[in-house]
Regions:
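N-terminal, positively charged nucleic-acid-binding surface of large information/translation enzymes
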Residues: 2-182
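Structured secondary-structure scaffolds
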Residues: 2-49, 101-105, 156-366, 370, ...
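Short, glycine/acidic-enriched loop or turn micro-motifs at the edges of active sites
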Residues: 55, 232, 530
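Helix-rich, typically C-terminal accessory recognition domains appended to large enzymatic cores
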Residues: 121, 332, 341-376, 380-471, ...
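Hydrophobic, well-ordered secondary-structure elements that form the walls
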Residues: 266, 295, 400, 428, ...
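Intrinsic disorder at enzyme termini
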Residues: 447-514
Length: 616
């Protein structure tokens, strides 16, 4: 009997002749996120993924490559394992349908279902697509072609064994009715129910037209149909053959994460097979949407397939993982945009999260901290727990970033860089601990880095307890801002050359879009203060219209305080904040500097204009 403190999550098994891409990555990262979250909850977790290696399509591909099918697939598997490693995916087993234990499981299952009378011999005649390894009806075709591959359909008639799928129509409908969360999202549940209500045809489960597969135990001339073979992997992976403690511990699966294109097989055929075996169906089938690229379907002809290396080269592994689940409501179709990924990396990860970590770790290193009342995390944690249970992964991130926003507002209101209040600094450090733990299923690498800076473990114990007072060192930059993929990929090459090429004394040109990113405004210096231990810096309070900024400026050698107060100036306002001599500087005052650096003159508007006016 499965216990509540166990969690079993699976992906579909992937066709090995494909290249791992954003679609398969999305499914597998989703399963990894759920596995990691449940591990934090102290559950014993089993996460299964793998490859589907039998069938006519593989047999033909192996023939083209002049290799035996097993040798052919053996050479393909490393690219999947390498891809998942690059994405920090931590599975328990990578199952292959060519594994010896799986082939045994399939034959045992076939024998059991056959003995029950749910398999019979007949003839199958239909319209077959080798690419899909599936039959279609006339009405499902598009101009006589496969609706998926758009290739001509092959008319086949062959001896076949059939599974009595039609026998289980009422069982399925009753199960859907009693378990409304079995198929998610809900719109897909209604699609399946409507199709099942129309009636079910018995399923052809064997072929004689190819030899690469698992023979039927009761007729060696027939090879098991690939989907009947593939679905059984969910049982093999946790020890069905031995009916081991592992199997008893984890079955039924908590959730099969799949793409919407294979929902029928998982929500109809699979539970019917399990009914025949007297096994309970999985608790949930979650069918997510498809990814397009800049509004277009991914295809080799368009050369727009986002493979794993391209995905992580844009802004790094954690930014890619974050983007996929922040950008799209989990379950819906999504559109991949490199531009939007970079915007989210810069605006949300670098500006909001990265700056908070940098600012607070610097304050903690400079002033230390003193235990105080933590910033309230319990309401957020309660919502996050429920959203994880509902598989609303995008909303989990929304909640976490709402909390990050509230921490940034708290810091802005309390101004610990001015007050040096150790209790405020502690409250922020404690909040960062909570943020890192909640983000860890999505961004494991980043969370681990944060945990090392603030000295805590990624665990439920750390989440439920306040941060221990300890020495903290300033965090390294977690998210380097980027403009283009080329700039990011070639950053190491650029370090070896002159970073600021000079032509006739002028730096190399920038794109107009880069200029548009700058927010430069007219400001008025309202107050000038000394900074302890600073020989060159003044602390300036500058009005830029609707708000005031604290800016540190190296003007002490060139201006008296009285010369600066009341003076209009030009301020670069969207420069990332940084700590200077223990003071957070929130922008930059622009000045002209002579070549010998003996003269520094503040740039001011020629005529009077209101504070906050934009420089264009």
């Amino acid at each position: 009997m499965k216990k509540k403190n166990n969690f079993y999550v699976t992906t579909p098994i992937y066709y090995p002749n494909d290249i791992p891409h954003i679609g398969s990555a999305y499914t597998t990262i989703a399963a990894d996120i759920l596995a990691r979250w449940n591990k934090i909850q102290k559950k014993e977790v089993f996460f299964l993924t793998g490859t589907d290696e039998h069938g006519k399509k593989i047999e033909l591909a192996a023939q083209d490559a002049k290799k035996k099918p097993k040798t052919f697939v053996d050479n393909l598997i490393p690219k999947f394992k390498e891809a998942w490693k690059k994405l920090n995916i931590n599975y328990n087993r990578f199952i292959r349908t060519t594994d010896a234990d799986h082939e045994q499981v399939v034959q045992v299952i076939l024998s059991e279902v056959h003995k029950k009378g749910d398999i019979y011999e007949g003839y199958y005649e239909g319209l077959y697509c080798t690419g899909c390894e599936a039959y279609y009806t006339e009405k499902e075709l598009l101009e006589g072609c496969c609706p998926v591959h758009k290739t001509p359909i092959e008319k086949l008639k062959e001896e076949s064994y059939f599974f009595r799928l039609s026998k289980y129509k009422e069982n399925l409908l009753n199960y859907y009715d009693k378990n409304p969360d079995f198929i998610s999202p809900s719109n897909r549940r209604f699609e399946i129910i409507n199709r099942v209500n129309e009636g079910l045809q018995d399923l052809s489960i064997s072929r004689t037209s190819f030899s690469w597969g698992i023979p039927l135990p009761f007729d060696k001339n027939h090879i098991c149909y690939v989907w009947f073979d593939a679905l059984a992997n969910y049982l093999t992976g946790i020890g069905y053959l031995e009916h081991s403690k592992e199997f008893q511990k984890f079955w039924p699966a908590d959730v099969h994460i799949i793409g919407k294109d294979i929902l029928w097989f998982h929500a109809v055929i699979w539970p019917a097979i399990l009914f025949s075996l007297n096994l309970e169906p999985p608790k949930k089938i979650f069918a997510h949407g498809w990814w397009t690229v800049e509004g277009q379907k991914m295809s080799k002809s368009l050369k727009n397939i986002i493979n794993i290396d391209k995905l992580i080269s844009i802004a790094g592994v954690d930014s890619a993982r974050y983007f996929l689940f922040r950008e799209v409501s989990f379950g819906e179709d999504g559109d991949f945009s490199e531009k939007i990924l970079i915007e989210r990396h810069n605006n949300e990860l670098a500006n909001k999260l990265g700056n908070l970590i940098s600012r607070v770790s610097t304050l903690a290193e400079t002033y230390g901290m003193e235990k105080s009342t933590p910033i309230k995390i319990k309401p957020t944690l309660k919502k996050v727990n429920q959203l994880f249970q509902n598989l609303e992964l995008d909303k989990v991130l929304n909640e976490i970033f709402s909390f990050i926003d509230s921490c940034n507002i708290y810091a802005q209101e309390k101004k610990p860089w001015e007050t040096k209040n150790k209790k405020v600094i502690y409250s922020l450090c404690n909040a960062i601990k909570d943020i890192a733990i909640l983000l860890s299923p999505f961004m494991p690498e980043t969370s681990e880095k944060i945990s090392k800076v603030f000295n805590f473990e990624i665990s439920i114990e750390s989440l439920n307890n306040d941060l221990k007072i300890n020495k903290i060192k300033k965090s390294p930059i977690l998210f380097k801002k980027i403009n283009t993929i080329a700039e990011n990929v070639n950053s190491k090459k650029k370090e070896k050359v002159n970073k600021s090429p000079i032509i006739d004394g002028i730096m190399s040109s920038i794109e107009f879009k880069d200029w548009e990113k700058l927010d430069i405004r007219v400001g008025k210096i309202e107050k000038v203060e000394e900074i302890d231990g600073a020989d060159k810096l003044y602390k300036l309070s500058i009005s830029v219209g609707a708000e005031k900024r604290t800016i540190c400026a190296g003007l002490k050698k060139y201006y008296k305080k009285s010369e600066l107060e009341g003076k209009k100036c030009i301020v670069f306002v969207n420069l990332a904040p940084r700590i200077m001599k223990g003071v957070e500087s929130q922008g930059m005052l622009l000045a002209a500097v002579s070549q010998d650096e003996k003269k520094v003159i503040i740039i001011s508007p020629e005529k009077d204009i209101e504070e906050g006016a934009k420089i264009r």
